[in-house]
């Protein structure tokens, strides 16, 4: 398979969205050197690592690039914020097509084992105290991931509610003529705190959080099932679960790319 033919790994249209976001490669002032690998090839290789979970050194020969080149470019693009902006650009496309529904948003968290430790890891209460992280996801009513985040495995789920809601409201461009405040927020009993309910109401967001020992999870689950599907999508990317990245910025970069792919 020739260079630049990556339809088997890159979804239709995604490269066209990503291409304007890629920072230009640095030009050697002295000239010379080997020819740069096409950005589209590097983009496909990074997606392959995310999907397969392989180490950089295990990239297939069909990409025609070294592990150091692929990893270095991933780090450069990650520090430039490419993956978060790609996710946001995909969301804008969907919103323009009327495919995002924020009448209801759904929040959930998943535990992820952290193989190598690092920042934003901690003893997991559901994995015998082994190092882990939590993946936080806010989706629209259809399960499209609107915002993703990561925290230590011993952080309570409820601690992620405020930053996720605030992050969703502030990251979208207000000049697009759309107000992104959700009308209602659905979450499970892990988020059942009086102060969070009061905070949401103060923002004029309807609260549909299951109450501990009172409300049936089955009834509220009619709205929350979409986030379970989204979590399943994200967990299917093998570079995310388990977590191999010691640097949380790298893990969040892969998570942002996965969110864009899920959309």
Language model features with spans:
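Short alpha-helical elements
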Residues: 1-263
């Amino acid at each position: 398979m020739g260079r630049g033919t990556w339809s088997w790994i890159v979804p239709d249209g995604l490269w066209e969205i990503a291409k304007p976001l890629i920072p230009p490669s640095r030009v050697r002032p002295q000239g010379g050197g080997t020819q740069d690998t096409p950005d589209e090839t590097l983009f496909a290789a990074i997606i392959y690592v995310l999907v397969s979970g392989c180490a950089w050194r295990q990239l297939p020969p069909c990409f025609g690039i070294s592990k150091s080149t692929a990893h270095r470019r991933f780090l450069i693009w990650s520090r430039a914020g490419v993956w978060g902006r790609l996710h946001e650009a995909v969301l804008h496309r969907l919103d323009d097509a009327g495919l995002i529904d924020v009448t209801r948003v759904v929040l959930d968290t998943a535990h992820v084992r952290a193989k190598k430790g690092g920042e934003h890891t901690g003893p997991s209460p559901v994995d015998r105290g082994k190092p882990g992280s939590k993946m936080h996801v806010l989706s629209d009513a259809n399960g499209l991931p609107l915002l993703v985040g990561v925290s230590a495995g011993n952080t309570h789920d409820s601690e992620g509610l405020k930053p996720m809601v605030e992050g969703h409201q502030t990251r979208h461009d207000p000049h697009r003529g759309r107000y992104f405040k959700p009308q209602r927020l659905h979450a499970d009993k892990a988020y059942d705190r009086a102060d969070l309910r009061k905070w949401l109401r103060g923002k004029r967001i309807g609260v549909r959080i299951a109450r501990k020992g009172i409300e049936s999870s089955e009834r509220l689950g009619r709205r929350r099932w979409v986030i379970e599907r989204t979590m399943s999508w994200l967990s299917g990317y093998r570079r995310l679960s388990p977590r191999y990245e010691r640097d949380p910025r790298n893990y969040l970069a892969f998570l942002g790319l996965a969110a864009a792919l899920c959309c």
